[in-house]
Structures are given as structure tokens and as C-alpha cells.
Amino acid sequence: MNKITYMTIKISIPKYMSRIYHGLFDTGANICICKKKVLPDELWHKTENLVLRGFNDEKHVAEYRADNITIMIAKEKFIIPYIYAMDEMSPDIIIGATFYNKYSPIELDIGKGIIKFTKNNEKYPNYLVKYPKKRKLVPWTKGNPSVTETMENIGINQIESRNPIEEEINQILGTDIYGENPLEKWEKHKTLAKIELKNETDNIYKPPMLYQETDLPEFKMHIEEMIKEGFIEEKTNFEDKKYSSPAFIVNKHSEQKRGKTRMVIDYKDLNKKAKVVKYPIPNKDTLIHRSIQARYYSKFDCKSGFYHIKLEEDSKKYTAFTVPQGYYQWKVLPFGYHNSPSIFQQFMDRIFRPYYDFIIVYIDDILVFSKTIEEHKIHIAKFRDITLANGLIISKKKTELCKEKIDFLGVQIEQGGIELQPHIINKILEKHTKIKNKTELQSILGLLNQIRHFIPHLAQILLPIQKKLKIKDEEIWTWTKEDEEKIKLIQDYSKNLVIKMKYPINKEDMNWIIEVDASNNAYGSCLKYKPKNSKIEYLCRYNSGTFKENEQKYDINRKELIAVYQGLQSYSLFTCEGNKLVRTDNSQVYYWIKNDTNKKSIEFRNIKYLLAKIAVYNFEIQLIDGKTNIIADYLSRYNSSDTDGRYDEANT
């Protein structure tokens, strides 16, 4: 009598993170079969077409076979002699007679949930699965086999299907844009990068590091993988060994979470001595604003972005690095070289610039956006053609198609709204409040920069802390209780942020309101909009800053005037269309802007210069009571001793 049951099995493949599946053990199946994505692509080889008969005698043709696959049940290893690929089945994997014959006899007691193998005469309770799941099948992740990859489950009786529109978009896109090696289609663009030193006679040399024994197999894995892919080569010319940077292994929390270490090269000396590529990286706010009136979004990621670009032959020597196994150099544009982002951005701009009315590119991240489904189909088809024509390789694993809400550049974008991604807040909350050095401070300030438009008066809070970045390396690092309290305060604010900001979609609703205020050492503003025929004012974003040293000597009126200018300038990207109203509670500033004057004092000449800069912007000015200017007042007047609250409302 045939017996079938599901059992937890782990598939372990060298150089890949392991995966756990609920395999169907079927004593009536003649062979082992699985869906093709259950195993890495390179394990499959073409075979003579094998006709498989399934339930109800339906026929399927198997074209691929893999041999000697290691699986684990409990902590014991077993070998599947051979297995065929077949996607037209519900379970991810079926274990059949080729396995049982190797390890027979096998005792299977479904009632007690026990399976027993003669391999070691041991029983394995609790590995039989009562409510099996199947996996969402994605490309395998390279890494340490001792680490198990986290995968999404799909109920075994569920149909794994896309939204019909998403499926249609996927059909338009096709599969030819995807791949694993970014050099696969390099001949289509033949892009080369050049590294130049400021002084050609300079040495770039740092001695090799001391390595832990546990690092050796990690280096071996990374080096073998990158040589195979064509990214690096062994350096045989030792005459120019004046170029050498040390490599090291990073295995921190994020690496442990993804189950794979990183090999990092210390290119500080190279970055100091190389000429700077002065090609700009686009402003994230500018990019996001371009897409905010769209409704449908598809996101793509260039596979191992920088590696699309090869290095000129004379530039390779500058990238030379040492590992325990020897001496190597890059054949492609390396990570860690400070010009790599600019070089790659220039490469991407050259390809996509004519299509920036519906495509956003930030280094290796790409967003296609459209207002309608039909428009999105056209845009996706165009993106496909551009990608194929220029030899770009896209990561299938990171592709998201036809979403009405999507994560991009640290925020969630949807039509008429920007929302802060929760993981950004979590990262801030996880940071220690005791900062040990400038590197740790730069790390948390980089995170806080991502929420600067969501937290009022942030510049004021950070002012004393940011000054510590000017401390020279040889000076003693100090971190006081007051500094610690400021980080704690920001973390407290982060727990209760208004994380979603609304923006107008229609031009008729673009009635912009900018509220400004200033204190002795800081200025602040907030941007709102008021839809047509509505009394509600929706909050869009905050902006704050601190006065320069010479500006701190100004009287409060001139500081308020600077606040007006900074508010108009910082929001100009959003307010270039529609009407603008600036609100201030400073009557002198209101008078200066509202009335033309011909005073000729030296002091007023400076003010007139600032007024001339402000006059570039077309806006109305409104004088309001200081008590009603709550948001802007909070922005600039922060003081931990006189406020324990915050303005949480997103509208008034």
C-alpha cells in the first residue's frame, strides 16, 4: 500500500545558503522530482526527454535532471541519487523510489509522526508535517551552507499567482533582462572606467592585516567566486607592488542575517590619492518628487551594479589587494572606490536620460512610474527594450512589478503621499546612545538625515553633536551625558512620528503654505498645502537648519528674513507650480517684504540684498499671531528644558 506524507527536509548546496522545504514522501512515486527553482540553476543538465505520468494519468515531459543532491533530515545527511525537474505539480519536491531504494527498508508511521531509516536505525519524530507549506520560489542566495535562508511560505492548497495585471506586465517584460553575471552582455555597451592618481608617482600601499583562522575559508569562497565570475584576477606582476590595499572579512549583524559574509577592501589610501570624478549623484528628494503624481510603480535593481563596468588595463594595478591566498586586482569597477557611484551614475544616465519623464535612476536602483495601467505597459516595454539594447543585467529577486505603493530610496511612495519606511525608524531605535567615535557618529547622523523632513527642529537638537565631527583624529573624543540625552530624545520622537506626508495630485489643489520662524541660533519651516474648496491644510514636510557663525550676530528680524528665504528655497522643488503663501509672525519682516523701501543705510543694504534673493520667488506674505505659528515655532525654539511635547497633527 502506497504511503504519502510531508516531511521537513533541508537542501544543502556548497557555496549557497541552505533551504528548508516540506517534501512529499510518496512510496508510490517511481522517481524523485521537484520544481526547477528548488535547486540552483547550474545543478541542472539537459537529459533525454522523460515522460512522467502523474495523478489521473496526466503526462508531463521532464527535460532537466540533477544528480547526487544532499538533503538533511534532522542532523543526518542523505543523498538523492538523481532528481528530475517538473513545475506542473503542487508540492515543491516529491521524494520517490530512487531515494527509498538507496535507504530501504524505511519504516513510515504517519499516525505517530515517525520515520525510520536503516542507515542508522534511528527514528525521527516530529519531522512529519501535518500542515505543509510550499515556498515562494526565488533564485538561490550565495553564502554559507551552515546558514538557513529565510523564505516566504505559500499554503500548499493555495495557487501561487500574480494579480492578472501584474502577470500581464511580467509577460511584457519577459525573462531576457534577468541574469546573475553583470558582465554577461558587456559587449553591448563596452564601457570602461579609468582610475587616475593626482600624482602618478604616489604609492598606494598598506601592509596585509592579521587574519583569524575562521576568515580563511570565507576569503577562499569569495576569491573563487569572483575569479569564476570574471570580476578579479590574480596579480602576476610583482614589480609594481607599490600598489596594495588589505582586504578583510565583515560578518556583522546584517551579514549574519543574510547568511553571507562580505569581503571588504580598505581603499582609504587609494581614495585619498585618486582624482575625484566630479559627476553628480542626483538628489533623492528631486527624484521622488518626479514620481509622486503617478499611480503605478515597478522597481528594478541592476545586478551587482558597479561590476557592469570593466576597468581600463592601466587602471587595474591601482586596485590591487592582498588576502591570505595571495595578491589580486580588480577587472571591474570595485565597491569601496569612492568614485564608483559617480562613474556608474554617469553610465546609467547616458542610457536612461531620454526617458526620465517615466524612469528614475539612482545609481543601480531604477523606478518606472506611470499614471495609468495602459501607460505603464508601454513604459515597461520601453524599459525592457532599453535594458536589452544596452546590456544591463537586472536582478529578478529584487524586481517588483505594477505596485500602487512601493519602497524606494528609504520611503514608501504612493500617489500623492510619501511614507517613511518602518525599518529606518527601527534602525534608529536600535542605535546605542553612547557614541564611541566619529565613525559611529557619522553612521547615526546618516540615518537621521533620512528622517530630517519628518522631525521638526532636528537641526537644533543635533547642533552640539554635529560639532564633534570637526574634532581632529589626534584629539580626545568626548561623549557627555547631555549628548546621550539628545540621541535618546530623537529616539523618543522617532517612536511617534507622523510618518506619512501628503502631496497634491491636481494642479488646482497646489495652494502651498510655508510657515517660518527663527530663534537665536536656528531657523525652521514647514510646508503644507490646502486643496481647492477645503479648509484642511495638509502637512507635507519639515525643514530646519542652524545659522552660520557670522549670522548668529544678526538681530532677530534679519534671522527671520533668512528663515523666509531658506523656506522658499528648500521647498522650491515642490512649489514651482501653484500658488504660494508665506506665513510669519514677525511684523518687521512682513513690512520689508510687503513694502518697497529706499533706505540706504549699510545695514539695510545687506537686508535689501536678501530681499532681492527672496523676490525671485512669486508668493504672498501673511502676518499671523505668534501663538498660531505652532509648527514653525517648535522647529526653531527647541530646548530640552522647556518642551516635553511635539506637534503631532498633520492638518489644522
UniProtKB/Swiss-Prot annotation:
Residues 21-99 form the Peptidase A2 domain. PROSITE patterns: RT_POL. InterPro entries: DNA/RNA_pol_sf (IPR043502), Pept_A3A (IPR000588), Peptidase_aspartic_dom_sf (IPR021109), Rev_trsase/Diguanyl_cyclase (IPR043128), RT_dom (IPR000477), RT_RNaseH (IPR041373), Viral_Replic_Matur_Polypro (IPR051320). It catalyses: DNA(n) + a 2'-deoxyribonucleoside 5'-triphosphate = DNA(n+1) + diphosphate; Endonucleolytic cleavage to 5'-phosphomonoester. Mg(2+) binds at D301, D364, D365. Keywords: Aspartyl protease, DNA recombination, DNA-binding, DNA-directed DNA polymerase, Endonuclease, Hydrolase, Magnesium, Metal-binding, Multifunctional enzyme, Nuclease, Nucleotidyltransferase, Protease, RNA-binding, RNA-directed DNA polymerase, Transferase. The active site is at D26. GO terms for molecular function: aspartic-type endopeptidase activity; DNA binding; DNA-directed DNA polymerase activity; metal ion binding; RNA binding; RNA-directed DNA polymerase activity; RNA-DNA hybrid ribonuclease activity. One of its GO terms (biological process) is proteolysis. Its EC number is 3.4.23.-, 2.7.7.49, 3.1.26.4. It comes from the Viruses. Residues 231-413 form the Reverse transcriptase domain. Encodes for at least two polypeptides: protease (PR) and reverse transcriptase (RT). The protease processes the polyprotein in cis. Reverse transcriptase is multifunctional enzyme that converts the viral RNA genome into dsDNA in viral cytoplasmic capsids. This enzyme displays a DNA polymerase activity that can copy either DNA or RNA templates, and a ribonuclease H (RNase H) activity that cleaves the RNA strand of RNA-DNA heteroduplexes in a partially processive 3'- to 5'-endonucleasic mode. PANTHER family: POL PROTEIN, RIBONUCLEASE H. This is Putative enzymatic polyprotein.
